[in-house]
Amino acid sequence: MGKMIYLMGKSSTGKDTIYKHLLQWKEIPFEKVVLYTTRPIRAHEKDGREYHFTDEVHYQELFKAGKIIEDRVYQTFYGPWRYFTVDDGSIDLQNQNYLVIGTLESFVKTTEYFSKDQVLPIYIEVDDGIRL
């Protein structure tokens, strides 16, 4: 049975660097969980690689269908942007291991959706003097 490793921590603690290194490990193969977002795509991004880019209408359809595992919304200058994980059939914890970067709140919701046995937390903490 696979596991989902959930990396968490404050900004600038090295989560992205650790994430990239772990994805390169061959001893423990990890798959990426590609999140969804309603924010606009940026010039260097590709749909399905960094995120699945969608809109509020599609989010509402997924929500009504019970497909949203966890979601967060941020109020921006441009309006609300959602980031969310969807049960779209791409997560197969029976046969694969996954690596995710998220918040404590998204970890809790993901654990409630799957189970404590399948979603394992790693909280990265770095002294503020080093981090900043």
Kindly label every feature range from the protein language model.
Residues 19-20:
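The feature captures the helix immediately C-terminal to the Walker
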Residues 7:
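Hydrophobic anchor at the beta1->P-loop junction of P-loop NTPases
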Residues 15-16:
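Walker A/P-loop
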Residues 97-103, 114-132:
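Conserved phosphate-donor/acceptor-positioning beta-strand/loop module used by diverse small-molecule
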Residues 24-32:
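Post-Walker A helix-loop "phosphate-sensing" segment adjacent to the P-loop in P-loop NTPases
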Residues 10-11:
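The conserved Walker
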Residues 42-44, 108-110, 128-132:
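Switch/connector loops and helix/strand junctions flanking conserved nucleotide-binding motifs
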Residues 37-98, 102-104:
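ATP-dependent small-molecule kinase phosphotransfer cores
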